[in-house]
């Protein structure tokens, strides 16, 4: 059975998101939506995910992305594994099942590392580990009939964290105004000379 799990702030339980995930092959999804999780730290999110996994029970393998698109800290998979007491493997590019174990390939700076894992584990897949599956109309219609379980954060009784990270603000880097300059390319040699001159004036050459 393939179970999708997501936790987060308001909007994480959007029906369209659940349907899209179920249409890609999941059997069911389990969701924890709570406003307090909108700015939760990595350790807090990992603790909630661990409690959800314990709630599901009898989980053989947890597969995550390597990082989130917003913070990209790459911390949740390893912290989650620590919460569960399971081994963690990052930058996974391939997973193959074999008798009583998993054969895992992971990218390393000078090549590929091959690992054999027995027992439950947390594997963080690299961004190019698999091509996203595009669900068809039949998949989306079937997804509407699959179960979606909504869990209350309070019911999970997540142990309090000794240290808590709080987001105190966000800022968008200021962009320098760009100087646009059009160059007539009717005469290639003249255009090239104008381009070189413009780049020198801008300090790019």
Named regions from a protein language model:
Residues 1-205:
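N-terminal glycine-rich FAD/FM-binding segment characteristic of electron-transfer flavoproteins
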């Amino acid at each position: 059975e393939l179970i999708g799990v997501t936790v987060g702030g308001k909007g994480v339980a959007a029906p369209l998101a659940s349907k899209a995930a179920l249409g890609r092959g999941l059997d069911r999804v389990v969701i924890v939506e709570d406003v307090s999780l909108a700015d939760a730290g990595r350790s807090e999110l990992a603790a909630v995910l661990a409690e959800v996994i314990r709630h599901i029970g009898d989980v053989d393998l947890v597969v995550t992305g390597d990082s989130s698109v917003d913070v990209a800290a790459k911390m949740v998979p390893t912290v989650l594994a620590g919460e569960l007491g399971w081994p963690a493997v990052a930058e996974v590019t391939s997973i193959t099942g074999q008798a009583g174990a998993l054969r895992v390939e992971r990218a390393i700076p000078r090549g590929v590392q091959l690992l054999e894992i027995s027992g439950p584990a947390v594997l963080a897949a690299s961004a190019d580990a698999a091509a996203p599956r595009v669900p068809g109309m039949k998949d989306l219609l079937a997804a509407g009939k699959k179960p979606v379980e909504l869990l209350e954060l309070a019911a999970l009784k997540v142990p309090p964290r000794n240290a808590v990270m709080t987001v105190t603000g966000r800022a968008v880097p200021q962009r320098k105004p760009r100087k646009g300059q059009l160059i007539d390319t009717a005469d290639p040699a003249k255009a090239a000379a104008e381009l070189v001159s413009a780049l020198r004036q801008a300090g790019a050459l």
